């Protein structure tokens, strides 16, 4: 439960790309709650590895809890809510909605993905339409299929 509640704490995309601030804040909070060291480490690993940007690294920590939280996080990123979130974030970052002169990129690594400043439209092809194939649980796969279909309509 703690991993689900804290997985987006101080999300790096709202902190100039700083991927350490979330785990540090969570660790401080968890220590104040006298959480066991093993549970603390497990929650911190969930926070560190839940993001899509870490899907380019095959050496990351995995657990059933992380898989479930990844699925839930990715389900939030697709479908009607995902479309709204995409354009909302694009507006927040002052990105173009569409530019025919900016090609869609198939990101091969975390750095390429994180450094992208592509228009919101490109994000559909660079991430959102890929998510249905990255689900772990049967329930998430079924829900992702429906939400994926909604996006391509």
What are these regions (language model features)?
Residues 32-37, 138:
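Inter-helical turn/loop segments and adjacent helix faces that build the functional surface
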Residues 18-32:
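An active-site-proximal "capping" alpha-helix that borders the catalytic cofactor pocket
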Residues 1-4, 38-46, 62-69:
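Alpha-helical scaffolds flanking conserved acidic
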Residues 6, 55-153:
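Divalent metal-dependent phosphate-bond-processing catalytic cores, especially two-metal-ion Mg2+/Mn2+ enzymes
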Residues 1-14, 22, 44-53:
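His-Asp-centered metal-binding catalytic motifs of divalent-metal-dependent phosphohydrolases/nucleases
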Residues 15-19, 80-81:
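Conserved strand-to-helix beginnings and helix N-cap segments that scaffold or border functional pockets
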């Amino acid at each position: 439960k703690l991993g689900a509640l804290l997985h987006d704490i101080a999300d790096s995309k709202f902190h100039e790309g700083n991927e350490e601030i979330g785990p540090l804040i969570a660790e401080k909070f968890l220590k104040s709650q006298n959480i066991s060291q093993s549970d603390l480490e497990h929650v911190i690993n969930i926070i560190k590895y839940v993001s899509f940007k870490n899907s380019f690294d095959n050496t990351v920590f995995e657990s059933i809890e992380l898989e479930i939280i990844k699925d839930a996080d990715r389900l939030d990123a697709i479908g009607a809510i995902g479309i709204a979130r995409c354009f909302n974030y694009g507006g927040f970052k002052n990105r173009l909605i569409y530019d025919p002169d900016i090609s869609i990129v198939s990101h091969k690594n975390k750095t390429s993905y994180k450094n992208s400043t592509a228009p919101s439209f490109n994000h559909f092809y660079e991430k959102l339409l890929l998510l249905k194939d990255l689900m772990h649980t049967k329930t998430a796969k079924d829900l992702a299929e429906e939400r994926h279909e909604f996006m391509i309509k």
